[in-house]
Amino acid sequence: MEMPIIKLKNFDGPFDLLLHLIKKNEMSITEIKIHEITKQYLEYIALMKELDLEITSEFIVMAATLIEIKSKSLLPKVKVEDETCEEDLQKILMEKLQEYKKFKKISAYLRERELSTGEVFTKKAEIIEVEVDNKLDDDYFKNITMLDLYKLYNNLMRIYGEKQNVNVMEKKISVDKYKITDKINFLRDKLSEKSIVRFSEFIPQCECKLEVVVTFMAMLELIKRSEIKVVQYENFGEIMMEKVIVNE
């Protein structure tokens, strides 16, 4: 007769093993049958020793705690103090176990998010060679702070995300499909038609988030070149782009 093959899960710690046993026995964390869990817990530790696996002091401490709770539950209740001590010990264990379960769930979510970053691709930086006058007048940012621009960008991402299916991603995006130089010329053309325009007007025309970002960067580049200024006529109002008229 062949010996059964025993597979031992690689547990992250004593709480991980305890959660496994609770799930296996279909128990609730708040209604653990200590006598059943303790027996199985000790069997797992014994199996670890047989397989020459490293057993940390944390596993031993947890086993001792379970044995203590079990022994106190079997002994006659002579004093009320002992009963309180037993209940407190078990309560502390349950609270720690529930807290561990929460962190385990969060770590699994973060691991999933980390893996999903592999689906994100960035565009190479586009070098724009131009002579820039670094002496910008404050009037180019009339009633607008960097925080306002940051909020504008986040709002644009949110608005675009609500109108598009964010779960659908293009398999291939050409590096030269959205260029800052093209968007600069696009904004120049629009400002030649109207001297003042709302930046948000251009977002519905964008095909993807990358195009929104490139358009936003084109606006910043035009501000840097002193060709436009951005204005906010009221608190929390829309950010307007205004063409700068150069006096000849």
Swiss-Prot record:
Record keywords, A-Z: Cell cycle, Cell division, Chromosome partition, Cytoplasm
Please provide the Gene Ontology terms (biological process) for this protein.
Answer: cell division; chromosome segregation; DNA replication
- What does UniProt give as GO cellular component? cytoplasm
Record keywords: Cell cycle included? yes
Q: Main localization of the protein?
A: cytoplasm
Q: Which family does it belong to?
A: Belongs to the ScpA family.
Q: What does this protein do?
A: Participates in chromosomal partition during cell division. May act via the formation of a condensin-like complex containing Smc and ScpB that pull DNA away from mid-cell into both cell halves.
Name of the protein in its database record: Segregation and condensation protein A
User: What is the protein's species of origin?
Assistant: Clostridium perfringens (strain 13 / Type A)
The organism's lineage is: Bacteria, Bacillati, Bacillota, Clostridia, Eubacteriales
State the encoding gene.
scpA
